[in-house]
Structure formats: C-alpha cells, structure tokens
Amino acid sequence: EISACLVGSEMCIRDSLLSVRATVGMVFQNPDNQIVANVVEDDVAFAPENLGVPPQEIRARVNAALKQVGMYDFRLHAPHLLSGGQKQRVAIAGVIAMRPKCIVLDEPTAMLDPSGRREVIDTATKLCREQGITVVLITHHMEECIGADRVIVLSNGAVVADGAPKQVFSQVDLLKKEGLTAPVTVRLLHALREHGMDVPIDALTVSDCADAVAAALKR
C-alpha cells in the first residue's frame, strides 16, 4: 500500500490527496463517460464547482477553457449533438477549467475517426506548447507520439523503451515484439533499408521521410 507520493518536488501524504488531485486532470477514452451535463458550458463548469472555485471565477475559467480547445461557439449546445472529436475537446476543456499542472489522456482517440483524432492531438499539443501544461498521452497509435518530447513503451507494467521519439521508433523490431506498429514513415524507411537503400530510419514526419528518400535516390 502506498502511503506517500512525489508530485513535482513535493512529498504528499494521504491527508493531502485532495490538493494533489487538483493538480492532475484525467481525460477518458470515451467522452460520454465523462460528460455529465446537458449543456456544454455547464459540463465544463462541473469540475471547478466541485473544487469550490468562486462562481465568477468559474465563468472566466469556463470561457477560457472552451476558447482554448476551440469549442467556445458551442458553449450552449447539447453535448450529445456533438461529434466524437468535439465531445472529447469538451472533456478536455472540463479538465483545463480545473487549472491542473498535468493532464493524463487515456486512449483519448480510440473511438474517433481520423478527423476527430487529429482534433484531439492538436488540442493536446497546443496545451503543452502554448500553455505549459504537462500532457501524458496513453495510446497504441504511434503516429500520435511523433511530436512528443519523450516516449515510454510499457510491457506488463515494465519499461522496455524510453527516450526521444526518434530513438524509440527506430527500434522497429522491439515495437513489433510488443504488439505495436511503428509510424508509417519509419516502416517505409525500414523496408527500404532492408532492400539495400541507404536511408535514415529516424525521419518521422512525412516531409522528413520524403526528403530522406529523395536524397537517397540522388546518390
């Protein structure tokens, strides 16, 4: 049983768990399991209300959070009328309104189409890069991790790979062993290398991959 945990540089004990929970927000795989209100802005207000935030500040937080995820114009809409990607962005807004230091996204795109997946990943990236919020993304879609600062591969609770995306995704055989598929760019470069073409295997983006192949063809 864990009786204490480390959050940032501070040691927290069981009696201070409430304050710890306020620093971490969670976004679930299915937004329908997280959305509780009949109006978008009411749903986003739910978490800060439970944290005892004053009403005037709640209003400011709700508006700011919805603008951050691009859903402010839908603030008076019914959540059940939104697309999957829009619902997930509302769920993220609800977490942002808590003003957490860290957001954990648990397979947030598993139930979304490609367009919805892109919406969610772009939102998460923006929160990290522009707002300075730590984002922990749990996913089986390796393409979603290309822009990450750090990638950790887990197998049965143990860390089997840990490093920058280029370092981790270049280990194609390891990923395959763990039931994961490397980004399509890496798979293409890996196949070309196996057929004798001298190309790097760590060009993750489509443009970098195209440049690497073009350079190899000129040699």
Q: Language-model features: where?
A:
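Conserved ABC ATPase "signature" region
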Residues: 56-74
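ABC ATPase "signature
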Residues: 162-163
